[in-house]
Amino acid sequence: MELSFTKMQGCANDYIYLDCRTAGVPENIAALSEKLSRRHFSIGADGIICICAPRTAGADAMMRIFNADGSEGRMCGNGIRCVAEWLYTHGVQKEQLAIDTLSGLKTITRRGEGLWQVEMGAYSTLPADLPAVNMGGAPLVDVPLEVDDNLWRVTCINVGNPHCVTVVPDVDALRLEEIGPAFEHHANFPERINTEFVQVVDATHLKMRVWERGSGETWACGTGTCATVAAMTELGICPAGEDVHVQLRGGELTIRVLPGNELRMTGAAETVCEGTAEVEEKRPRPLRHGFAVPPLPKGEALAKLRTLPHCQRLPLWGS
């Protein structure tokens, strides 16, 4: 199967973008995302984003996100800026775009060359909106959470997808590959959760690292950055109504909390490359002589091995 793609990144949060507006999303999209996202062995990315025909009147397109493990996400802040940039450079040259997501319709405004502002919608701290269980019914702001026998103070935010935000003294000192999975798969979050670890520089400047469900540590996460600023506002650390600049491993995003808990994100979107991939369907592996070996039940396979002279002297068989 021949597949045309565009690789794009926002703050180094990179995805493979497929134009699915006419043909629709490939049936094997989950397996395809796993295969093509493998770094060093394939194109390499945080997942695949499909640009689809809109489902809402007045929308310009719909975005569907598939993580590197094949699971489907609901919203991606960095990804939606790249979708807007892709549409703008592929004939939809509007200064304001409307894009469908599984978290609702989002409005994106062009603010310069490759620079986009996204109205992300309102956030919620209620456990039912995450969802979160065994944490009561009150807003999840500065609550204790035991993770691998360690007690953390967390603020949980839904910004179209679920996030768990915690303040740490030094984000660079964290061993995210160890603690990230423990947060992601915590029993209190039945649909898993994204986790942001944030270091406060001052009231309008933060440093952040993120562990994304389904992808592991990524160099940036737009929704995670929004959740982080929302959490810091809830804690009284960052001011509402002002731009807060968040430094991630892949770059900087600017977030503002507006009245009604609405969030606005501004950041860049860039095309890395375009290309065509030849994706092979899985088949039985052929031998050099050109025929395939059919799979055998275990018992038959052992019986055939026993007939080979060089195997009969080996202690392989038991009773």
Segments from the language model and where they lie:
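A glycine-rich beta-to-alpha transition motif near the start of alpha/beta enzyme domains, typified by
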Residues: 1-114, 164-279
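Short, acidic, Ser/Thr-enriched surface-loop or helix-capping motifs
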Residues: 67-68, 157, 296
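Membrane helix-loop-helix hairpins that form the core translocation module of multi-pass transporters
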Residues: 113-117, 121-123
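Active-site glycine-rich loop that binds ribose-phosphate moieties when present
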Residues: 124-153
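Short hydrophobic alpha-helical segments enriched in small aliphatic residues
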Residues: 290-292
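Glycine-biased, low-complexity coil/linker segments
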Residues: 299-300, 317-318
